[in-house]
Amino acid sequence: MLEKALWIRTPQDIGTVSPEFRKNISVLSKVKKATAFVSAMGAYELFVNGKKAGNAVLAPGFTSFANRVLYAEYDITHLVSENTTLSILCGDGWAHHHFGFSKRIFVPHISAIAAFLIEYENGEKEYICTNETWQVYTSEILFSALYHGETVDKTADVKFIGNAAVDDTPHPALQKQTAFVTEQEHIKPAKMIRTPKGELVLDFGQNIAGYVEVKVRGKKGDKIVLSHAEVLDKDGNFYTENMRSARNLCTYVLSGEDDVFKPTFSFQGFRYVRIDESPENITEANFTAIVIHTDMERIGSFCCGNADLNKLYSNIIWGQKGNFVDIPTDCPQRDERMGWTGDAQVFCRTAAMNFDVEEFFDKWLSDMALEQRDDGAIYRFVPFVGWWNGNISAGWSDAAIICPWEVYNAYGNKEFLRKHYPMMKKWVDYVHGAGEEEFLWLGGEHFGDWLALDAGEGKFLGATQKDFIASAYFYYAASILAKAQAALDIDNSETLELAKNIKASFRKAFMKDGMPVLYPKYDGFTEKREVKAITQTSLALILHFGLFEEHEKDALVKALCALLSESGGAMTTGFLGTPYILHALSDNGCVKEAYDLLLRKEAPSWLFSVAKGATTIWEHWDGIKEDGSFWSADMNSFNHYAYGCVFDWMFANIGGIKILDGGAGYEHISITPHTDARLGFAKCGIKTRHGELSVKWSIEKEYTRYELDIPAGTKAVFTLPSGKTEELSKGSYMFIE
């Protein structure tokens, strides 16, 4: 439909004002159906006779703009009339914004494209396409930027600029958009406070990604100015230093009538909103926070008898909501919000348990494939926004194989796996040829065990040798590729042989007498830090990835428990050790020790942030320290979902639900709950593609009760603590032991 449409832009530079492209049409007879097909390089909203079409925000989203931009299809039948005005309001969005650390602007100017198909009841069809006959106007949006907020002036004089200019600069391919960011929830302020500095601040009680809607009536020309923050400082004052250069400032100029304001082309990450300027009669009733994220069905649930653990689960859910705004971001508030691959891969399994994220990840992974280098390399963030020349990093770039596999395993869609398989294979081939040693990944600028606590105060890089981590992930990637090939009926004998050789080379280079050792060719970032062979992360990776021989297991587990004891029962792991440490313990007979880590309240721990009042997952274990001070000012997000990956352990061990090899989509599962008296009871549930699956256990005085619901199409092997097993199919069951 868009083949005959032209990309159009403003005929002249109009500064930061959002342009509006208009076309007046006459509808000649009774309409059977009217459909719009719209996209923009920037962001857009479509209006028909002044009414918004659809419910998407920030369309067309963030894609690999060098390769593709998405268009949406709207049914506008109910909006057209005899005399119809078509209007496309545009903003900078991701494409025309100083985005990422490199402050990249993808396109020189905003442009839009649209086609409209009107089908009449008499069988005739009419096509209207964007071209130079469309007219361009200014708008009330004087400024908008994803990082910096929006300025809307209801008193602005909207001016006709002239006819649109045809934009003849190169544009990427147009592909249909299927996943949309939408408004999801509305939250009223929990309270309005005065800080010690005298600031008037709204507390919405929840850290979110979204924006604030203001409904107000005041004098014409009066202003409302809103600043956004995630936390208050230790004195109770408004705190924005961790936003870095992101201003997150919304300014609204009142018309003198009843006004409704909210950003159109910006969003913020916040819990607190400071009212910097407002009419005198403003109250908390004038404000509503609106949560936005990609439209995803909630499928998972968890509750137990431990209030702190329930709050942690809530924080994990909110962390996912806040960072699944079109792409999987690191954070939704500061001048970053990029599609970091490492964060996404460690959280992917948890994400697929909480929401149906197949469509979400399909979009993002499609851009990853488009940006995969010819040699198979994958950048650290997708879409790529420059910076560091796209250097590759183990555990980050491995998202190319881990994410497709985890999504397939969660939902069982072989076509999804088949689509992304070429990227997976190319990635493993890249690592295979990346270094001087065929079966090791040596050298390169890896992030390593990012933000681990075992390399010294204030260090970003953990103590675990990065060549060790990279080579361990090489083995993990090859192992996953072999599973993917088996699922797709592709011969995997070469990949199995590759994995065997990687394991042998890894053990020769990085292990001696069954324990980790340092490899002499250490390379990586030049940050001065202590590098250690035996760390919590190195042991967890060996145990979880299966890089040990069976006779070595007990000593490795004992060493891991000893390190935990030496650190006072605390984890020192970072981004790449944390996802696996609990699994490494519980899968090898140390369930209590895993529970102890999960339920620990002192820093560093998952429940420390809960005790500090967190409503999302933090970037640092001690983002807010015991004394109320902050870890740092420049890199301290309080909505950073990666450590929320712990829920996949909770689901697999508290709930006991694990997908067995060959049982993708919960077709074949094991159920082995590990109970703990500190929880009292627990219930895990998920809406699988087969139906509702749930496991509940409760500890009574003399026994533990287990209640299971198994959907049709699922075969389950249930194991009781005594070792007794039951093979179950569709039905509801109760066991007592």
Feature annotation, model-predicted:
Residues 56, 471-489:
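Conserved, charged catalytic cores of large soluble enzymes
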